[in-house]
Design a protein with these regions (language model features):
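Bacterial N-terminal signal peptides that target proteins for export
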Residues: 1-11
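Bacterial N-terminal signal peptides
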Residues: 10-19
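Beta-sheet-dominated interaction scaffolds and their linkers
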Residues: 25-51, 147-164, 199
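Short, hydrophobic/aromatic beta-strand segments
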Residues: 54-62, 176-183
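Intrinsically disordered, low-complexity Pro/Gly/Ser/Thr-rich segments with frequent PxxP/GP/PP motifs
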Residues: 72-73, 77-105, 191-219
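Terminal connector regions
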Residues: 103-144, 148, 217-246
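Structured core of small recognition/catalytic domains
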Residues: 180-246
């Protein structure tokens, strides 16, 4: 379980904006920003905050979370339940939410889910014809396997036909990794050649690519060069040497 903090829906994950018939000052905060369950801890607790001044109703939905071709895939599940499924928060109010595991953890690999918190439309106000933003926030739920859970990363770099540089990451471990950012430097250089912001998750057994466009003022190194990669992740800082292939 990582650091506890509050995220605002306006800056958080999976923000959904929908137009209806009223202006709202409500927004959603959640603490902590993820839940980690296991055979020893089958229930996790989250606190949902209404950081605005207007009352708001929230509906919870848990989805199985997988990835395919670098994209998130969500499917319905009953393996994790969130309770209460629907609740109303006054302005400035909070609600304790519990996420409970309803199956045995996998013996070898981490299981991954997401809890979606959807703000529900309020009763219509016939006296106002403005717009309302409905917040939708998503946060991850990780279920640890019986074995030790650890991401194992393989980085690759290749020049593309248009001169860009494609950085590829494959996670061959049995647990996720979240890449917060990474930088690439030439050996002996005091300054990074480029820094890439990310915040991307790569689940176990999955891959992700980043394409860094060609820049005449700062062109990618040629094939055969070795880049020094430094990444900040939710598992700590990591370094790797990456060979650029044609």
């Amino acid at each position: 379980m990582l650091k506890r903090e509050i995220i605002q829906a306006a800056y958080g994950l999976f923000l959904l904006v929908a137009g209806v018939s009223e202006v709202s000052a409500a927004s959603i905060g959640v603490s902590p920003v993820r839940a980690t369950l296991s055979a020893d801890q089958q229930v996790g607790a989250l606190t949902v905050h209404n950081t605005g001044t207007e009352p708001m109703s929230v509906q919870l939905e848990v989805m199985n979370w997988s990835q395919q071709d670098g994209k998130d895939v969500f499917t319905a599940t009953r393996e994790v339940l969130a309770n209460p499924p629907i609740f109303t928060l006054p302005g400035g109010g909070s609600q304790l939410v519990r996420a409970g595991l309803r199956r045995a953890p996998d013996a070898q690999r981490e299981l991954t889910y997401r809890i979606f918190l959807q703000e529900l439309p309020p009763p219509p106000n016939p006296d106002f014809n403005g717009a309302r933003m409905l917040m939708r926030v998503s946060l991850p739920v990780f279920v640890l396997p019986a074995l030790a859970a650890e991401p194992v990363l393989r980085w690759k770099a290749a020049r593309t036909s248009d001169g860009a540089l494609k950085i590829s990451l494959t996670n061959i471990g049995n647990a996720h990794i979240q890449i917060v950012n990474f930088s690439l430097s030439l050996p002996g250089s005091a300054q990074p050649w480029i820094t890439q912001q990310s915040s991307a998750y790569v689940l176990q057994g999955q891959s992700r690519d980043w394409t860094l466009p060609a820049n005449a003022e700062n062109p990618p190194p040629p094939p055969g060069a070795i880049l020094q990669l430094f990444a900040q992740t939710d598992a700590g800082d990591m370094e790797a040497d990456v060979l650029i292939t044609p």
